[in-house]
Amino acid sequence: MLLTIDVGNTHTVLGLFDGDEIVEHWRISTDPRRTADELAVLMQGLMGMHPMLGTELGDGIHGIAICATVPSVLHELREVTRRYYGDVPAVLVEPGTKTGVPILMDNPKEVGADRIVNAVAAAELYGGPAIVVDFGTATTFDAVSAKGEYVGGVISPGIEISMEALGVRGAQLRKIELARPRNVIGKSTVEAMQSGVVYGFAGQVDGIVARMSKELAGPGGDPDDVRVIATGGLAPIVLGESSVIDDHEPWLTLIGLRLVYERNAPKFA
């Protein structure tokens, strides 16, 4: 089994692969205060319930792949792999890790590991040109060229951040449930806020993707040839309202981690 771990700013997602198939997954809160020992106990509690794994941490795991946007958590996970997984090969996606995707940025080291991993998965599963829209703490748009290169992207505030800002900065507004309203024209303050978030973000996605697709296609190219893939925990909120999303792959980042691990596997032989 291959254990993949995607550490985001808000949530950490763990996925278990048997070959190419993801057979189990877990989502926990990301807490920078957790120590390596606390993470190990939490992971053992989750994975110890799986019938294909043993009761000891590391039983049944032949490899580990990790990407993280929170440096302190990455440090602790590195310690987890060293102390609790012994000789199990581990790939941590960071500058210098072999991904197979050229990064055409002014400073490749500043690109988030999760964004690179998403590009790896998109290029492998769908080919290029493609745009990955990841609905997380931030909403990110990442562009993959027809040659499979990572060429850049867009970062905007995420859905939950925007809703929290409304509740904090609006004197007569409050925190509300993140849900699709009955109509665009809200009949209550709650519905009006929900409408602003859901349809506002759908419009943002459609507008940004249209502009990115035109740039990716280039002179004489067809922007409609650009494949648009949605991922991230909040993607379902916008999926039914956006007119540009072609595919939804909730496990895109975990799949990308599997691919990066496989591309680095020969060095473990």
Tell where the protein language model's regions lie, with residue ranges.
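Phosphate/pyrophosphate-binding loops at sites that engage ATP/ADP/AMP, CoA/4′-phosphopantetheine
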Residues: 43-63, 208-225
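Short amphipathic alpha-helical segments
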Residues: 16-18, 77-80, 144-146, 241-243
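Phosphate-bearing ligand-interacting subdomains
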Residues: 47-55, 61-82, 86
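Phosphate-binding/catalytic loop of phosphoryl-transfer enzymes
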Residues: 79, 87-91, 96-169, 198-211, ...
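ATP-binding/phosphotransfer module of carbohydrate and carboxylate kinases, centering on a glycine-rich
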Residues: 1-4, 34, 162-269
